[in-house]
């Protein structure tokens, strides 16, 4: 939520229900069905039903309640969460040798999210619309087209922002969770013995009964906790307390009641296995439930899409992705953004997935492997924070990490079979995103190092210009400078070709800190290098966007007055050429050149008026 507009705890808690729990809240649509009637073929056996219910309940307690809500959410970076935030936090107090390892872990976790997010909207919306099979079996052939239509509308409204309809998310999701609970109670009343499954002995009995097959069945149980990363990622919007209150007071009871209600129904009517969620409702409620389920899955999909936009912005600001056009869709909420490239890329991928897999059961078979992979990496990073930042006892952290990894790695291994039934898709997409991010970061680092090594001393140039000044013209010139003590290429080329300088020259460096936000007091530092040269360093958090007007305002407060329409911005446009490299580095270099050519230009990135920008080309060998 916007930090400038404090709201009451009940209001923020209600808002958290509407956004944070969309994904995990729509899991009852398909989870128990896939556990019993999916690819593992357990059927509606008493031990299987009780065993799966027990596993689902204890995963909700151990993974969601204890691991994420009580442990991982303690690791906040100025109140913000998410895998990249956790990566930055973990790297603060570690040595130079360990930091690159933590960066790779964080990037893999972020890449897994990109891979899984393609499946989430597809499986959620399809599972809701498949309720048509219960209402009118003859409409089955329209499930795929209707799913595509619903998601097409969702992706098309992204550019308009969700501020107006977003106010409806919380009431709709609250109604959804109340409906889950009521339907669950309705089922449990007819067969209350199902509550025995709360006892973990039924989970143990399940493993004893089905042995090896039961281990791989964990791949289906994981569907009950997909979306758990959203709890941590959205912490900055709502805060820890509202998210925790929402879970323990509304979401957890509703989920448990609904899962157990479905189990009770199956024990009484095994034929309901074709869709136990919808068959839990009375006939008169089918159509309203279908509409409500569709709305809930659309809201869940919206939360995932917003999460992708947020993660992408963080990656861009931290230097792991090339600059992209980021549009703010709300004047009130700083977190509401729209990234056209990511939006349409995700839309194409989601539609292709729906058309290719055709049924939510096929998608569920591919769902979960990237989620569990991210859970493993989150455990490693959070325990690193516990040791290095919180200074917990090494033995305690080691035991905690071992316990978490036993659980997470078991679920990740159980999902390994999904690779052959579609799980390769999120892994492939995640791998491609990881390659793109690591390529951009590493090649950009090498490029800046090359510029620094071959650059001339800034101090020497300023001293020379003060002794033998060139022709001066009125006004202020701003030169974007990446390296602090190296002459910007644009400044050199301006002197070489135009042989003039402005009366005042500002060398502007933009820095991204590993904190989500930077206080305005620390925003800008100014250093006078000579009577006509100034160095300005503007610092921003990885969840903020540089604002040139704000920078100029801060400069004015420090005594350096700059007016946008009286300032010329000189920027270098780099033309990259590949030098001699091994074949594998040649491929990486070509990918970097493609990313660079399609990156958002600096004037567009910093919203500088086009008529105030002068771009000077320079050729650099990489």
Curated annotation (Swiss-Prot):
What InterPro entries does the record point to? K+_transporter, K_trans_C, K_trans_N, Kup
What Pfam families does the entry give? Answer: K_trans (PF02705), K_trans_C (PF22776)
Transmembrane ranges? 9-29, 52-72, 99-119, 137-157, 165-185, 213-233, 247-267, 276-296, 337-357, 363-383, 394-414, 419-439
- Places the protein is found: Cell inner membrane
Example of a GO MF term: potassium ion transmembrane transporter activity
State the reactions this protein catalyses: K(+)(in) + H(+)(in) = K(+)(out) + H(+)(out)
Protein origin, superkingdom: Bacteria
Q: What membrane topology was assigned to this protein in its record?
A: Multi-pass membrane protein
Which GO cellular component term is one of those annotated?
plasma membrane
UniProt keyword terms in alphabetical order: Cell inner membrane, Cell membrane, Ion transport, Membrane, Potassium, Potassium transport, Symport, Transmembrane, Transmembrane helix, Transport
Function, as annotated, reads: Responsible for the low-affinity transport of potassium into the cell. Likely operates as a K(+):H(+) symporter.
| Protein family per UniProt | Belongs to the HAK/KUP transporter (TC 2.A.72) family.
Q: Tell me what this protein is called.
A: Low affinity potassium transport system protein Kup
Source species: Sodalis glossinidius (strain morsitans)
